[in-house]
Every structure is written in C-alpha cells, then in structure tokens.
Amino acid sequence: MSVAKSKESFPRSAHALLADLPEETLRRLEIYANLLEKWQRAINLAGKSSLDDVWVRHFADSLQVSQAVPDARRWLDLGSGAGFPGLVTAIKYADEPGALVHLVEANRRKCAFLQNVIRETSAPAIIHCGRLEKILPALDGKIEAVSARALAPLEALLRYAEKFVDQGAVGVFSKGKLFEAELTDSLTAGKYLITIIASQTCSAARLVLVRRRGG
C-alpha cells in the first residue's frame, strides 16, 4: 500500500473527492495511510485488498459523507473501527475552529490505533472506547451529524442515533447494494425524513440521510 505516488499526481487524480483538498489535508491523510499500513501488520484494521486502494476505497469514500452535510462540523461516528468515515472527517476539518468528531469504538486495539493517528495528524477527535449502548446515553454536547459505515441495519443505527437526530442532527449512513431491504414502512412513514444519495465511489452503494421531519 505505497503512497509514494502522492508526490506526483496521486492521490489528487485518484478521485474527484480528493482533487480540491488542501496540501496539508493530503499530508495528514498520507500520515494516516502510512500508519494503517504499519498497524495492519499487527491487527486487522480492514481488508488487505481495500487497503491497497486506501485513497479511493476508504478516504474518498469517507469524504463524501461529510460532503453530504457540508455545514456540519461536530460529528458523532458510530463503530469507528479503523476510522472510516469519522477520522477522515476530523482530518478534513482539522484546521477549522470548533470542529470536533466523537469516535465510538469498542475494540481497545483499534482505539489505540485511532489515538495514534489523532496524535500524529492533530485531528480534532475524541475517542470513546466502549460499547455504543454504554457510551451514547452519557454523551452530551452539540452533535450536528451522525455517521456510520458497515456497522448495523438501518433500524439499529437509528436506535443508536435517535437521541441526536431528534435534537436536530443529520444521520449519514453508508449502505451497500441491499440497502432498500432496510427501508421498512416503519422508517419511511415515521418521524424521520429519509433521503437517498448515490455513492460517488461505488455504483452499488448509497448514502442514507436521515433527518427529523420538520427539523
């Protein structure tokens, strides 16, 4: 998973989502990519084939999440894993005053990895190491958007995010090709307004945006 090409035209040419990033953001993402490669040797952070294409499969894919709610700077990322999309969001907004991303992850080794990336990139993020069921009830403060990727079915995600969406946050959930099966009548006809956005990195994937009706 070499990032040497970034010294020439890569990663800007890898995907449109990367094209307009400031040099400092690209530098931080390159640090992130190198740490992924280093830590992957000891712990399973993500599938090896996906890390071979980390700039598109993970970084660009994560960038479209924050792009979907462009005014949000205070995020909550559920089940952060190796940091997609939450840590990428934090790196994107690293130089913006007031930006903060809460990363919730139960695996302590992954939490250690996330902390290492935060330290090396100065990303504005806080790690909450523990299960969602224990962390979320005690989490206070302004949250403008809630993200999750490859974590749980939509109904379960909404149970986790309900408190924050009811307070005005927007849920942004990355879903695969079977996402339509998760759009039950109870969700689409309930108190939430659901918007589907086509993924810019995978033709079969979608972003599911969830807002409180009237919010």
Locate the predicted segments by residue.
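A short glycine-rich, Lys/Arg-flanked "PGG" loop and its adjoining helix->strand segment in the class I
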Residues: 158-170
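Active-site capping/gating segments
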Residues: 127, 176-215
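Residue-level signal for inorganic ion chemistry
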Residues: 36, 89, 175
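Conserved beta-strand signature within the Rossmann-like core of class I S-adenosyl-L-methionine
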Residues: 168-178
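Class I SAM-dependent transferase core
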Residues: 1-76, 109-123
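Conserved beta-strand segments of alpha/beta enzyme cores
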Residues: 100, 124-126, 170, 192-195
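Conserved SAM/SAH cofactor-binding pocket of Class I
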Residues: 63-148, 158
